[in-house]
Amino acid sequence: DKIISGYRNIIARAQAKGIKIIGATLTPFEEAVYYSEEGEVQRQAVNRFIRNSGEFDGVIDFDAVVRDPSNPKHILPAYTEDNLHPNNAGYKAMAEAIDLNLFR
């Protein structure tokens, strides 16, 4: 997959220079005009890579924070106004999910 290959390239180059790389998962986007099932499959694959590869120095799971548990391809209604972008409450939840120790 080109996205994961791109991540691996960036990770290797950055870490070779002593730069920490923090991965952040991709949030749901089913209501976007460009949504496709293939895109969702890719999003899930990228998120699995970010969460489980061990290649990042840390991970922030924005997907887990904002997704609707009853419909995981959607952002929780309380966290969005357009079903695609987080609103202030969504961004607040995302910010609160960041472990600042990742940056030390």
Locate each region found by the language model.
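Structural beta-sheet core signal
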Residues: 23-24
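Oxyanion-hole/transition-state-stabilizing segment in secreted/luminal serine hydrolases
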Residues: 1-2, 28
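Catalytic His-Asp segment of secreted/periplasmic serine-dependent ester chemistry enzymes
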Residues: 27-104
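Surface-exposed amphipathic alpha-helices with a cationic face
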Residues: 7-15
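Well-ordered, non-membrane alpha-helical segments in soluble/globular domains
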Residues: 3-7, 43-44
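A short helix->loop->beta-strand "cap" motif at the edges of active sites that frequently abuts
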Residues: 17-20
